Design a protein with these regions (language model features):
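Alpha-helical transmembrane segments and their immediate juxtamembrane cytosolic regions
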Residues: 1-366
Length: 366
């Protein structure tokens, strides 16, 4: 078996740090705002590595087992949506978990049945953006349009599939190609920004050409940078964050919302970034230690059925927004620490031959 490429964990780790910068729920000006805009491309790195890890699973997993798992991944993932929007409207918006599910399944089908050559992945990635940019807004409303095309907010199929496909290309291409792509996209970004920069061009949901160029620059730049390192220290905190990036996703957001609720948003922004990062790192260690005592209870379908029902039911029966956030955060963290058990259960239910547990779509080892 090919040795695991730790650069994937490193890329996920840096995207975790960028998430903290991007998700502080305050609006800043000057240098801090520039950092926030650039950090907003963190999902691009998430999705890119998810595309890569999917291709590594094609020969080891059946589509049926992936389909069952990612349907539940998307549903339980609404816990994350509900932390941002603690009401039933959250079910109408595509966020990180839902687009990961769609992106992973799409890459799997593409890789397994079409086996496109390397550069076709790049062309398909750009074609996805072209469909978003030139076709999506011209179409009339139709059922599930908010899943396929961006309307207001959310990570819809077009244009965000581009990052999954682009990640596969970046991983398989030589590092020289990654450097060239970084320089070309960065140069084009400078050219299109020469006449002035409008912040409206950097709203990630309704992806513009400047935002695409920024995303490509960061995506290929990250693959170029982290693949230059031949080895990583096992105890590297960046790898730890990348390895447990799904848990990081829920933990950091819960802490950001909690600190904001406590009024800590008045602190200097750099102090808030550091506070959230340290508390997230420590909190993940505590949660994973505690999970050793409860993981065994999630090796059966019944507790997972309870988790799925709870994610959906909480905003329907609980009127208090803070309590919704707390309960959905707990459910999301529980899922993030124990998704392997669910993956194994889904594999066993589809095939009598027990398949290996699914690697974390947002950064676990394969």
């Amino acid at each position: 078996m090919k040795p695991y490429d730790y650069s994937l964990d490193a890329i996920k780790g840096i995207s975790c740090i960028l998430m903290i910068i991007a998700h502080i729920p305050l609006y800043f000006h000057g240098n801090e705002r520039v950092f926030q805009i650039v950090a907003g491309v963190a999902p691009v790195l998430f999705f890119a590595v998810s595309g890569v890890t999917t291709t590594l699973q094609v020969k080891r997993r059946s589509f049926g087992s992936l389909l069952g798992f990612y349907v539940l991944f998307a549903v339980i993932g609404f816990a994350y949506n509900l932390m941002w929007r603690p009401d039933v409207q959250a079910f109408r918006i595509m966020d990180v978990p839902q687009i990961i599910a769609l992106g992973v399944l799409s890459v799997y089908l593409l890789e397994k049945y079409l086996k496109p050559p390397l550069y076709l992945y790049l062309l398909l990635s750009l074609a996805v953006f072209a469909v978003h940019s030139f076709i999506g807004h011209r179409l009339p409303d139709f059922p599930l349009k908010s899943v396929v095309f961006t309307e207001t907010v959310g990570f819809t199929y077009f244009p965000w599939l581009f990052a999954f496909l682009g990640g596969v290309f970046a991983y398989r291409a030589s590092n020289r190609v990654n450097l060239i792509m970084t320089l070309v996209a960065g140069g084009m970004l400078v050219v299109v920004s020469y006449g002035g920069v409008s912040e409206a061009d950097y709203v990630k949901y309704n992806m513009s050409m400047p935002y695409l160029l920024l995303s490509i620059t960061v995506l290929f730049g990250a693959f170029y940078l982290f693949r230059r390192f031949k080895s990583y220290a096992p105890a590297n905190p960046l790898l730890y964050a990348g390895k447990h990036s799904l848990l990081f996703l829920f933990t950091h957001l819960f802490l950001i919302l909690a600190f904001d609720r406590l009024g800590l948003g008045r602190l200097y922004i750099v102090l808030i970034w550091g506070l959230v990062l340290i508390c997230t790192y420590v909190g993940m260690h505590i949660l994973l230690w505690f999970n050793r005592y409860i993981a065994q209870y999630l090796e059966h379908f019944l507790p997972w059925a309870v988790i799925v029902i709870s994610v959906v039911a909480v905003p329907l029966v609980i009127p208090n927004r803070d309590l919704i956030i707390l309960m959905e955060a707990a459910l999301g963290m529980l899922f993030a620490m124990n998704y392997k058990q669910l993956s194994s259960l889904m594999s066993a239910s589809v095939s009598p031959r027990r398949e290996p547990a699914l690697p974390e779509a947002v950064g676990e080892r394969v």
